[in-house]
Amino acid sequence: GKGSPILLIHDMLPGGSGYEWGKIEDDLALEHTVYNLDLPGCGRSEKSGITYTNFVYVQAICDFIKNVIGKKTDVIVNGYAVSFVVMACHNEKDLFNKIMMVNPVSLSSLKQMPGKKEKLLRRCLEIPVFGTLVYHMVVSRDAVNNEFIENYAFDPFHPDRDLQDAYYEAAHRGGCYAKNVYANKASKYMNIDITRGLKEIDNSLYIVEGEAENNGEAIVEAYKNVNPSVEAVMIKETKHFPHVEAPEQFLEQVGIFF
């Protein structure tokens, strides 16, 4: 597209990828240069045996803006990945313009650090055959469909089949390293307390919350308590993917904010 850059960053659910922005990226491209990034270890990006921590993603996002976009950019980010963008912006605020956060994850959950149980979980998932078997149970066709029905779709009877397929496919791409991102996230190695970062950044921040998102209202309140300049809007009849379930209303909010 043409116009000011806008960077889209997907959630970190097992099988997450830039595919989730498919329903809005063409419309965004009418007024912006759109960059749809698959984060390291996700989607079509390379999957490797490294420990995926918050810092790895902060670095990847900053490098992408510096080397590919080459100027200050607006960002739309979904779910858990909000934590990466907040920290990246806190570290290098000259790279970021406005930030739209879609259903950000709760601040309290990000404060949880790996304990003995989590370290054991990660070790188990790293065992070659056993770990891969467990991971394949987590991202089996039934498990992915159930996640959508229970946690992501507003209407459990009509989840977005194409998105489900994309999640299933991306979760299985990358051979034995496909499980790595999941192993590090499930064992809390990706967590980082973003409270200070959120408090100290003075960029325009806008939360878009799905009406039925679990704990949505409480999460928005917590973000506003830390940084009172945060604005928020709720999109009716949506849950975890408002940009998939109600693309028109979502684009309307993008138009208002950017």
Where are the model-predicted features located?
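Flexible "cap/lid" loop of the alpha/beta hydrolase fold
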Residues: 90, 98-132
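Catalytic active-site module of serine/aspartate enzymes centered on a nucleophile-bearing elbow/loop
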Residues: 228-258
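Conserved alpha/beta-hydrolase catalytic His-Asp/Glu region
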Residues: 110-111, 136-199
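Conserved alpha/beta-hydrolase "nucleophile elbow" surrounding the catalytic nucleophile
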Residues: 10, 77-82
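Conserved HGGG/HGGXW glycine-rich cap/lid loop of the alpha/beta-hydrolase fold
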Residues: 1-44
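Short glycine-enriched nucleophile-adjacent loop
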Residues: 82-93, 99
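Conserved loop-alpha-helix segment in the C-terminal half of the alpha/beta-hydrolase fold
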Residues: 200-238
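Active-site loop/oxyanion-hole signature of alpha/beta-hydrolase fold enzymes
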Residues: 22, 36-76, 251-252
